[in-house]
Amino acid sequence: SITSEFIPWNNNSHKKIIKALLVNTKNANTFTGKQGKESIDTIAKNLSRELTLKESKNQKGTKETVKIKDLIFASTGVIGEEFPMEKIKNSLPDLVVKLRSDQNKMYWIKIASAIMTTDTKPKLAYEEIIIGDELVRICGIAKGSGMIAPNLATMLSFIFTNADINSNLLKTLLKRAASNSFNAITVDSDQSTNDMVTIFSTRALKVGQNLSLNDKIIQKFELALKKLCLNLAKQVVVDGEGAKKFLT
């Protein structure tokens, strides 16, 4: 099947720990051939260097090396145009400098707005649950509008949680949540080349790495994740390109 150049990059990573996600809009990096593939390689090397340099100046904690295989990418935009590698590469130093660890609602709105293409509004969702005495947070953003069909299509969604859940289990939970949300919507029945939905854990809150689908903690988390994904999927449909009706 035909995909954007970032899809095989992400699939070949096989990393359970990802340290950075870079998203670009306006260019899908699809049907770009050798130039598109080499662009990702170049951007990855430069982003790796900039993030490692930032870590070397970190006064608050462990200084880590960020390798190119610690990175994943997403693209959305026009298909078949030359990928603007130089423009993106030259913007990386300033982009990395602006990275921050503290967050608020406006910060998330800015991120959701930055990935918009034909969307008319940013799409965000938030869920929280209590596990023991701890607050588990799940936050997600998405973009969509045109060409949304089952099995995703031109839709990107990035979900984040502080719960330190085993990566394989987290992947299973996301697949189950997506099956009745992102993979069950359509706007104009066309499928795209840049599908992506992913979930990240900051691992800040230890809930247990040896949990399974049968554990009540995981079942509680899964319900919240499914609710969040359905919320985002509905936002994508409601804001569909030219959409005037929402059928369920």
Residue ranges and their predicted role:
Residues 158-161, 198-202:
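Short beta-strand-to-turn element immediately C-terminal to the catalytic PLP-Schiff-base lysine
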Residues 49-52, 66-182:
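Glycine-rich, mobile lid/loop segments that gate access to catalytic sites or pores
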Residues 199-248:
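A glycine- and small/hydrophobic-rich beta-loop-beta segment
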Residues 2-12, 39-52, 171-184, 223-233:
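Short, well-ordered amphipathic alpha-helical segments that serve as non-catalytic structural scaffolds
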Residues 34-36, 80-88, 201-213:
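Short glycine/threonine-rich loop-to-helix capping motif typified by GTGT followed
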Residues 1-45, 72, 147-170:
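Glycine-rich phosphate/pyrophosphate-binding loop regions near the starts of catalytic domains
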Residues 54-58, 65-70, 102-112, 126, ...:
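Flexible, glycine/charged-enriched surface loops at secondary-structure junctions
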